[in-house]
Amino acid sequence: MAKILIVEDNATFRQSLKELLFTRFPSMEFEEAADGEEALEKIHGIAPDIVFMDIKLPGENGLRITKKVKAEYPELIIIILTYYDLPEHREAAFQYGANHFLSKGTSTQVIVELVQSILSEKGLDSQGSLRD
């Protein structure tokens, strides 16, 4: 079963994203983290398949956390999801190891399609289970 970690300091946005994804992928496991330190603990503890990472977080920013995580878990898919949708942020996200970059204004359909695409690439079905 696939696991998704949502790293976002805004509890309302974090919950909204979780609800959106749960509606489409109800058998997946979802975890949340409000800052970089909690994110690192959860990544080590649950080994998620996908991480949604905000850039602006309390303490260490999401780009630095992404770099640390990718050094240890290069196969982990990290999606930067931020309001900072500027070319320099996008470029920095990819330099730090992010796999995808989305604006928080991105349509829910695009987010769901991206998750579905990642699951397919990982050999998982639409519910996050291994395909037979």
Where are the language model's segments positioned?
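Acidic, metal-coordinating helix/loop segments flanking the phosphotransfer/catalytic sites
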Residues: 32-50
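Two-component/phosphorelay signaling modules centered on CheY-like receiver
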Residues: 11-31
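Conserved acidic carboxylate
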Residues: 8
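Active-site residues of response regulator receiver
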Residues: 54, 82
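Short amphipathic alpha-helix used as the core "switch/output" element in two-component signaling
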Residues: 41, 63-73
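Acidic catalytic/metal-coordinating carboxylates
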Residues: 35, 61-64
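The feature encodes the CheY-like receiver
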Residues: 58, 86
